[in-house]
Each structure stands twice: as C-alpha cells, then as structure tokens.
Amino acid sequence: MAAVHARIASIFLVFASIMQPASSESGAGVSDALPSALNIAPLAMPDFSFAGYGFGLAPIPTESGKVIDVTHHGVISNDGKDDAKAILKALAAADLVRGLVTIRFPKGRIQIGEIIPVERSDIILDGAGEKDGGTEFYFPRPLKIVDTSDRENELRDYLKREEKFQVEPDQNISFLFSEYSWSGGFILIGPKKSRAASYLAEYDKQDTVLTQAVSGRQFDRQLIVANISRLRVGQIIQLQWSANAGENSSILKSLYGDISGWNEKQTDPKMKLNIGLRHWESAKRPTVAQSTRIIAIKGNTVTLGDPLLHAVSAVQPALLAAWKHLSNVGIQNIRFTFPYSPWFGHHLEQGYNAIYMTGIFDGWARNLVIENADSGILTDNAASLTIANITTTGNHKAHYSVHIGAVHNVLVRDLRIENPVIHPLSVNTRSTRSVYQRATVLCDGIIDQHSGSNHQNLFDQIVMNVKPKKRDDVWSYALWVGGGAPYWKPGHGRMNTHWNIRLNFDADAAKGTTVRVTSGLEGPGAWIVGLHGNRSLEVDYKPDAYVEGTNAAIAAAPSLYDYQLAKRRKRP
C-alpha cells in the first residue's frame, strides 16, 4: 500500500508539470482527445455515474399514486392567510394511505409560517410549476422566530461548547454562530425523531451492527462478509469504516494517501497538511460511511449497488450497519419565496432555509426556484438523491445555494445560481462520491471543499463568472476557497475531481495576459482536468494535484458523469 501511495504522489508531480498545453492569450482551445486521466494506472478514477436516484440509471418516477389535494384540507392560495395548518392536515391524511401518495398544491401563493415535516416514505410534494403563474410557497418569517422545537438542541450545545463565534473586529461582530447557518429547513424531510447530523459524542449511539465486512477491493462491488443471516437482497445498509487506531489508522491512509512528501518540502508550518482529531475521536461514529443497497447475495459474498469507496481487509476493517431512512420522497414544480432581508454576516443567518433533506435513500428535488434564501437546499445523512433544475435567485446574500453535506451519491444537475452566495458549490463534511454537474454560477464563483473527510466528489462541466484581482502586475483568481475547522482538516481527501470547468472573466479584466488560478491549502490527490476560460490560465493548487489539459475544453467527454454513465449502460 505504501508503494502504491508513493507512486501516486510521483504521478501527480509529473503530470502537474507536463500536462498543461500551451495556449493563446485569448483563452481556451478545444481538445478532441480523451484526457489521459481516464487511463492512468494504478489510479483508477472513481466511477461517479452511480450518483443520483437509482444509482444514476433509474428514471425519477412519474406516477402519482393516491393524490391528495391540499385545497380539500383548507389551503386557499392568494388569500394572504397562513396555510401551514391546512398543509399539515393534508400530510396527516397522507399518513393513512398505504403506498405512493402525492400532495398536490394549486397555483398561486401559499403562505407557510411554520416547519412542515415530511416523515414518511413514498410521498411527493407536487406543485403546478415553478415559473410565474405556478405554485409559490411564501415564508414571511425565518426559522429563528418560528422554530420552537428541540430539533437543533445538539447543534446549539455544540456551538456553545466549541465557542463557535463569528469574529470580525472591523465590523464590530463577535456573535455565536446561528444554528440555522447549515442546518434546518421549512420543508424538513427525514424520519421522525432522527438525528440529521452528529456533533457531540454524548449523543452518539452505536448503530445496529448487521455483520462484519471481511474483504473487498476498492471500487469493486463485491464484498465478503462474516455472516449473512441478517442480510437480504434489496436491503439498504450502511457500510462503515472507522479510524479505530487513531491517526495511524489504515482508513486515513486510504483517504489521504502519503502526505509526508508534501510536508517535508514545506518551510512554513502553516502549509503542512495535518489530519484533524475529529476523524477518530468518537468510537461510535464512523470516519467514512457508504449507504447503499444489497443487490445480490451468494454464499458470503454480497454484491452492492455501487462500488466500494475503500478497500476492506483485516488492517482496514469495516462493518455493515442498519440505517434509519425514508425512500422514494420527492418535491417538485414549486417556487420558494422569502422576503428580502439584510445580510447580518457569515454564520449569522436567521434561517430562511427552504428545504432540508435528511435520512433519505432514493429521493429527489427538481424544477424549483428559490428566492432570497439563506440556504436553498441543505442535505445530510442521505444517499442516492437527484437534485435537478434548481435556480436560486434574489438579492439577499446566501450561505449555501444547494449544499452537499454528509451524503453519498448525490447528483446536483443543472443548478443555476443567480444570487450572491458565500459557498456557491460546496462539498461538506463526510460528503462522498457526489456530483455537481453543469452548474452555472453567475457571480463570484468559487469551489468550497469544506474539510471533514469529504472525498471522491466531482465538479463536472461547471461554468462560473469570476472577477480576478491584480497585484504586483500579476492577475490571479482564488477559485478553490475551502472552509471547515482545523479539527476536520485537510480540506478534502483523495480523488476530488474538477472536470472541464470554464471560467468567464469580466470583459476588461486581465485582457491579453495569463490569470493564475489559485487555491488555499486544500487537500491531497485532487484531479484538475480541462480547466479553461476566456483568458489563458495557469493552475496553482496546493498541495500537489494532478493537472491536465489546462486551457482546452474537453470535447471528447464534456461531462465526466455522462461519459462514465454511457460506458455503464453499454456493459452487459
């Protein structure tokens, strides 16, 4: 394993220096060749095409099942009165229905003044369209005012104990973080009384162990287990790897590779990579979790719905655990509107959050417009979601647009970000093999790799409008601006991939020159393939990354997700 990591490091260094083609100062060319990144051994690039509903292959359901019309339960659009109680009555009626049920909303403005929990499987919230003349959900007050539940108590305790204060002396800001900065939503989807995210060790409970995993190769779908008596075909389980040996655990080496080579070269201690203690400090909390479906069982060999994130062996153990979740839950064809409100500062959001998707396997959100939110869609503790055709808009500065949190196999497709957002595209703590595909960021585009063992994520065919800065006659743009606390560093694990990203610079900025595209200290093992724009670009990524095809759009495979999905569909 050490030899493999060493070879990986050397390959990254070689290609970082030789694989950037010369280009004209006018910007991008076009490459008709497939990038070499697709064929480099032993670096088997993850197959990202398993992200999304039905492991990327199954279409989102179009059937409605039993339809419940909310107007039959008291919803009256456009009357200026609150409709939350009537919606809750409709949901109570849905709970009496076995099988698929659709909650149907009429055209017009529907006012909602409290949290709407969606706590069952096989349910769709369906409006009459997200455009003008369709269905509009209007939320006049933030969660800070309307949420009187205890759902966020663990997070509130965590913020106080960790002394999570936003401190900006020049703005006279020294305030405790808001619990709604990255959590909570008015449409709250998840199992009843479930824990959306873990913060404090005393809240941790050992998940029910179904069996121990014995062996399996990374990126294979077959896994040998110790006992199959509690397993069945079609079962949703969570495969868990833990760093039980602390900072020397094998799973951390699989996550981050050998970082010693980078660290030995650094004279500035701030530029050294350190693995934070959150990776191993809770014995009941996995370091890496993969929620998946059992497709087949033969003897003690289990076939999973998607490839193993990491190998399983005696030195890198894993277990199969039960996982509380909903399935087949969707929300679609609706516009969400919040009143314009002042921006009080980073981490001080008041909770104008539209949707929080948690504890879901096979779910979706599609055809939504979200205006003036603090966060449009937040996700945690979920897997196999498709979030498609979302537009976030408005003049209010947001924290997140569509956030990829502690989730696995989430596909965010055709996202359009029109509003100012602190973290417009963000893979957060514990996000794995998730994808932003064809997102368009209209202002201040950045990529946030938010620490917390996020790894094997894909930014695919993204278009970003950006404004470079000039200093000492050098133009530069900070594209990779990762957040996260020191105890969750590095910024990301191996194989976060940036594919065919286009940067559009202001018409008069950096004209006739090369722009240096920079990062902070991110994480090891990144892939940056086909970064291009309307200026000549030079990549400066820290630590060393695999960089190929800069200044040339990838014509042969514009979308890596689509390319890999097409190859899967051709397999017997």
Language model: regions and residue ranges:
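Beta-propeller domains
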Residues: 286-291, 296, 302-317, 321-332, ...
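Catalytic domains of carbohydrate-active enzymes that cleave complex glycans
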Residues: 439, 460-572
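Sec-dependent N-terminal signal peptides
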Residues: 8-16
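Bacterial N-terminal signal peptides that target proteins for export
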Residues: 1-9
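Extracellular beta-strand solenoid repeats
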Residues: 104, 111, 117, 126, ...
